[in-house]
């Protein structure tokens, strides 16, 4: 797991609404999302960080080898980069971003386990 992926602080943590990766708000702004930046372009854009992440999430899992972990398969993160992931993320991506993802062939499924989609 790359050190820049691990949250550097326990304050100001946010989770990506697309992949549930957990980082600080500054890490998302500085590095973007390790899994989704090709689609969400959060790097250097604080407004996109606020739109595409949530500060409200439940539980975290540290994934060193997501491809080998049954937990990562259950959480739907087995194809993602090693890192710290939220179990459930409250919130949804804005409709405009969901439409853009769909036009690029990326299926968006909410990571909020309280909402059945």
From Swiss-Prot:
Expressed in brain, heart and liver. GO terms for molecular function: zinc ion binding. GO terms for biological process: regulation of DNA-templated transcription; transcription elongation-coupled chromatin remodeling. One of its GO terms (cellular component) is DSIF complex. Keywords: Activator, Metal-binding, Nucleus, Repressor, Transcription, Transcription regulation, Ubl conjugation, Zinc, Zinc-finger. It is found in: Nucleus. Residues 1-40 are annotated as: Interaction with SUPT5H. CDD domains: Spt4. The keyword Metal-binding applies. Its main location: nucleus. A zinc finger (C4-type) spans 16-36. Ubiquitinated by Ubr5 when not assembled in the DSIF complex, leading to its degradation: Ubr5 recognizes and binds a degron that is not accessible when Supt4h1b is part of the DSIF complex. Coiled coil: none annotated. Belongs to the SPT4 family. Component of the DRB sensitivity-inducing factor complex (DSIF complex), which regulates mRNA processing and transcription elongation by RNA polymerase II. DSIF positively regulates mRNA capping by stimulating the mRNA guanylyltransferase activity of RNGTT/CAP1A. DSIF also acts cooperatively with the negative elongation factor complex (NELF complex) to enhance transcriptional pausing at sites proximal to the promoter. Transcriptional pausing may facilitate the assembly of an elongation competent RNA polymerase II complex. Interacts with SUPT5H to form DSIF. DSIF interacts with the positive transcription elongation factor b complex (P-TEFb complex), which is composed of CDK9 and cyclin-T (CCNT1 or CCNT2). DSIF interacts with RNA polymerase II, and this interaction is reduced by phosphorylation of the C-terminal domain (CTD) of POLR2A by P-TEFb. DSIF also interacts with the NELF complex, which is composed of WHSC2/NELFA, COBRA1/NELFB, TH1L/NELFD and RDBP/NELFE, and this interaction occurs following prior binding of DSIF to RNA polymerase II. This is Transcription elongation factor SPT4-B. It comes from Mus musculus (Mouse).
């Amino acid at each position: 797991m790359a050190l820049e992926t691990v949250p550097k602080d326990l304050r100001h943590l946010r989770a990506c609404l697309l992949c549930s990766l957990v980082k600080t708000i500054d890490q998302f702004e500085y590095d973007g999302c390790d899994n989704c930046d090709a689609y969400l372009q959060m790097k250097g854009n604080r407004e996109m960080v606020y739109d595409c992440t949530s500060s409200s999430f439940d539980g975290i899992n540290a994934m060193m080898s997501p491809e080998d972990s049954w937990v990562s398969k259950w959480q739907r993160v087995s194809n993602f980069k090693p890192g710290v992931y939220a179990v459930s993320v409250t919130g949804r991506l804005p409709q405009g971003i969901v439409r853009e993802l769909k036009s690029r062939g990326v299926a968006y499924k909410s990571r909020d386990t309280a909402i059945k989609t």
